[in-house]
């Protein structure tokens, strides 16, 4: 049951912490990016089932593309095995105690390279974060092209 929602700011990690401070009396916390309007009830159910088993879960999909890691000079440094590469979506779901511990730990550190809440949990607690399948339609709308894709989803 959702107790309350908060409007975001410029830095999502600070927003997550603000949300954690508002919902102290809960067992699990679901952190969702408002730029992903196509999250489904089925995705939520899979994520909640996984977090109950593991304590930390991110939604995502196996990458359909080959991914290259680059060096600082713009050359390919490494090509990870595609079978091990997932593109991560939201929601990200955690036990309240775990995500709160992670955020409390990082508060006084440089957060400029933090990309999501799972990264905070990984770095600050060492906890494993499980993967749960999302949907290729659970896209993040950040560019005009994304909006075109979203409109196409709505037409079908």
List each language-model region with its residue ranges.
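Short secondary-structure boundary/capping segments
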Residues: 3-4, 20-21, 48-49, 76-78, ...
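Short, flexible, basic/aromatic active-site loop/helix in glycosyltransferases
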Residues: 68-94
């Amino acid at each position: 049951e959702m107790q309350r929602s908060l409007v975001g700011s410029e830095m999502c990690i600070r927003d997550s912490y603000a949300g954690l401070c508002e919902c102290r009396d809960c067992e699990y916390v679901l952190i969702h990016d408002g730029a992903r309007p196509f999250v489904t009830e089925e995705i939520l159910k899979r994520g909640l089932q996984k977090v109950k088993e593991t304590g930390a879960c991110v939604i995502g999909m196996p990458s359909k593309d080959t991914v290259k890691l680059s060096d600082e000079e713009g050359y390919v440094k490494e090509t990870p095995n595609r079978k091990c590469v997932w593109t991560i979506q939201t929601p990200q779901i955690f036990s309240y105690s775990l995500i709160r511990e992670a955020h409390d730990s990082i508060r006084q550190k440089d957060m400029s390279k933090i990309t999501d809440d799972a990264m905070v949990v990984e770095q600050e607690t060492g906890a494993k974060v499980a993967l749960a399948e999302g949907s290729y339609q659970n896209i993040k709308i950040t560019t005009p092209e994304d909006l075109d894709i979203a409109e196409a989803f709505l037409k079908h």
